[in-house]
Amino acid sequence: MMMQKLRRSGEFIRFGCKSLISSRPNKDSVSRSVSGFVNHYKSKGKLFELSDGNYKTELHHPCISRNVGMLLQQYKCFGSSAASLIQRNPLFSSLDSKDVSYFKEILGEKNVVEDKERLETANTDWMHKYKGSSKLMLLPKNTQEVSQILEYCDSRRLAVVPQGGNTGLVGGSVPVFDEVIVNVGLMNKILSFDEVSGVLVCEAGCILENLATFLDTKGFIMPLDLGAKGSCHIGGNVSTNAGGLRLIRYGSLHGTVLGLEAVTANGNVLDMLGTLRKDNTGYDLKHLFIGSEGSLGIVTKVSILTQPKLSSVNLAFIACKDYLSCQKLLVEAKRNLGEILSAFEFLDNNSMDLVLNHLDGVRNPVSSSENFYILIETTGSDETNDREKLEAFLLKSLEKGLVSDGVIAQDINQASSFWRIREGITEALQKAGAVYKYDLSLPVEEIYNIVNDLRGRLGDLANVMGYGHLGDGNLHLNISAAEYNDKLLGLIEPYVYEWTSKHRGSISAEHGLGVMKANEIFYSKSPETVALMASIKKLLDPKGILNPYKVLPHSLFSN
């Protein structure tokens, strides 16, 4: 009765606190969620730690102030743990033979996968870090079949995990327990392409590289380019709001996705597949599904604005002595290259050494070894003018001491070898051993400070490296070690999240939260904001069957 009253009152922060402190078996999850709560309000000057270890609060919101004492007691009690414990939601049903028979009726035998070998692959994430125990993978061929699957699963309270190319890095695309896998790989048709507007409409299972190949024949390019383009699906890209190499030029998917079709938990099909660049009729609901990681609905079709393929593409590989030079170079590139600047990527010397040591056929394009390397890509319509512009920029940067060495690719093969270095870092990390990956968004001037701080903190325990999309403030922080161990993880987390929050950053720039960072959301979002997100989740997925244990703190849904 008390819980119903709290839900009706809309005082979700109070409800959230109640959930947090009632889930004692998940004490590490509780600690993380409460830790984020504490850090958020300490940073806003509303919460003060006293010399005796207690806290004084100046929170006046009635939903928070009544429960802050209990919250803080839990925080002090549990401390900060490196591991997250998740319990299977007991309200979810378990799969039985009748369920399997139903799915075979609507999908056909071959599209209901029970084979252990195929399930082993589908249950395991790309980094082999997260592994579920699903006994069933479904392969729908169209939106109607997705609708039938979800309507049935919702009625039976069978949890579902949407899956595409399974290239995610935060455990978002694999089961946590025995969730039914719904893989959209067979939904891979290109439905239409308008060469006047450049609008492409396709199904969610289309592989990004295949879309790029198709568009190339039409004289267009995708606004999105990723290292995983050979495997990732456009539906997964949209569901995680993937960023990639071209964001500095073409912006995020919130800007380039014009419309989408999605199926909600109860099987309802939401047709928002517009192709218009302007539509001011009410709430633009597609944005709820972009970046929601399949927790609000399964994206089945996408309408995306593509760009004309320009004739002039140039790529420079540059060496810089320090991070300050990299920052200044970015400012100069924006001023001097302007509209033709299409990528500005960076990697440190540790990343370069890793690639050289673990990938065959890769070499450093510049003669001198430096602390940092930059890839600058320009895209325009005048080959001669664009190249002269890039050469003049590099010469000027060399004279200013911002660049110590550099080379411009002379042909497509050399350009590919440059990109191989940047895109091969993740592959090299896998070959090197255990890796702890963090995808952070920070003010550009702060990006490398966390790398240096973490090196000092970890010492010889691990190899810390930083690379990423400097043009949009996205750092890929990677810690490479011989093996995974709790001591190392305890030194990394929650330190990385606390550092990022302190410097007004985001703990997820483009990879999403998944299961890895669901409990860490408070480091980047206020409790009020998370409460509203949870309300939206409950509205669209009342039984919580869609990608459970992901995106939002597990404790909010434990009841």
From Swiss-Prot:
Top-level lineage group: Eukaryota
Field pH dependence: Optimum pH is 8.5-9.5.
GO cellular-component term (any): mitochondrion
Residue intervals passing through the bilayer: none
Residue span, FAD-binding PCMH-type domain: 130-309
Knockout-associated phenotype: No visible phenotype when grown under standard conditions.
Cofactor: FAD
Cofactor notes: Binds 1 FAD per monomer.
Protein's GO biological process: alternative respiration; photorespiration
Alphabetically ordered keywords of this record: FAD, Flavoprotein, Mitochondrion, Oxidoreductase, Transit peptide
Chief location category: mitochondrion
Extent of the transit peptide: 1-78
Keyword Transit peptide: yes
InterPro entries named among the record's database cross-references: FAD-bd_oxidored_4_C (IPR004113), FAD-bd_PCMH (IPR016166), FAD-bd_PCMH-like_sf (IPR036318), FAD-bd_PCMH_sub1 (IPR016167), FAD-bd_PCMH_sub2 (IPR016169), FAD-linked_Oxase-like_C (IPR016164), FAD-oxidored/transferase_4 (IPR051264), Oxid_FAD_bind_N (IPR006094)
Catalytic function, reaction form: (R)-2-hydroxyglutarate + A = 2-oxoglutarate + AH2
EC number: 1.1.99.39
Stated induction or repression of this protein's expression: By dark-induced senescence.
Location in the cell: Mitochondrion
Gene Ontology terms for molecular function: (R)-2-hydroxyglutarate dehydrogenase activity; 2-hydroxyglutarate dehydrogenase activity; FAD binding
Pfam hit, one: FAD-oxidase_C
Function of the molecule: Catalyzes the oxidation of (R)-2-hydroxyglutarate to 2-oxoglutarate. May be involved in the catabolism of propionyl-CoA derived from beta-oxidation. Involved in degradation of lysine for the supply of carbon and electrons to the ETF/ETFQO complex during dark-induced sugar starvation.
Family membership: Belongs to the FAD-binding oxidoreductase/transferase type 4 family.
Subunit structure: Homodimer.
Full protein name: D-2-hydroxyglutarate dehydrogenase, mitochondrial
